[in-house]
Amino acid sequence: MTKTVFVLNGPNLNLLGKREPGIYGVATLDDIEASCKREAGQLELQIDFRQSNHEGDLVSWIQEAGEKNAYVLINPAAYSHTSVAIHDAIRSARVTVVEVHLSNIHAREAFRHHSHVSAVAKGVICGFGAEGYLLGLRALAAIAKEEEKNGQSIKGA
């Protein structure tokens, strides 16, 4: 069975490739989407790739993923550090989440060191640039195989 992964991207990620390339790299969000689609095909995953600058959209998409029994690979961007709403959406949707960040949030400003999402994520990948998305997809594919082997759904963190 092919598992769906919602690849959710938070605020300002639509500016990738232009915004602080020394921190976030030169890959655009379109580049990342294309590489995710290629990787997903090899991993027998289906992806639904989305971006919004609005917190409520991310909350609604997390809830939708839960309703569809999909996984979530999320780069919440700045909402990592501020959004209890996204934390609560993940917890209430009981969805399997991998959090990804292009930069190493722990090597940056102190206010970026804490993520509300990490507490409810299955795992966190940060500091590997656009490659982090592919690592996240591989992790979710491994979880899907384990679930299929055991005939179960691994929900939440």
UniProtKB/Swiss-Prot annotation:
Keywords: Amino-acid biosynthesis, Aromatic amino acid biosynthesis, Lyase
One GO MF term attached to the UniProt entry: 3-dehydroquinate dehydratase activity
Site (Transition state stabilizer): R19
Xref: CDD domains: DHQase_II
Pathway membership, UniProt: Metabolic intermediate biosynthesis; chorismate biosynthesis; chorismate from D-erythrose 4-phosphate and phosphoenolpyruvate: step 3/7
Protein EC: 4.2.1.10
Gene3D superfamilies noted in UniProt: Dehydroquinase, class II
Keyword Amino-acid biosynthesis among record annotations: yes
GO biological process terms on file: amino acid biosynthetic process; aromatic amino acid family biosynthetic process; chorismate biosynthetic process; quinate catabolic process
Catalytic activity as recorded in UniProt: 3-dehydroquinate = 3-dehydroshikimate + H2O
Keyword Transmembrane recorded: no
Enzyme class: lyase
One Pfam family per UniProt: DHquinase_II
Active site: Y24 (proton acceptor), H101 (proton donor)
Cross-referenced SUPFAM superfamilies: Type II 3-dehydroquinate dehydratase
Annotated substrate binding sites: N75, H81, D88, L102, S103, R112
Function: Catalyzes a trans-dehydration via an enolate intermediate.
HAMAP family, sorted: AroQ
Family to which this protein belongs: Belongs to the type-II 3-dehydroquinase family.
Subunit structure and binding partners: Homododecamer.
Full protein name: 3-dehydroquinate dehydratase
Lineage: Bacteria, Pseudomonadati, Pseudomonadota, Alphaproteobacteria, Hyphomicrobiales
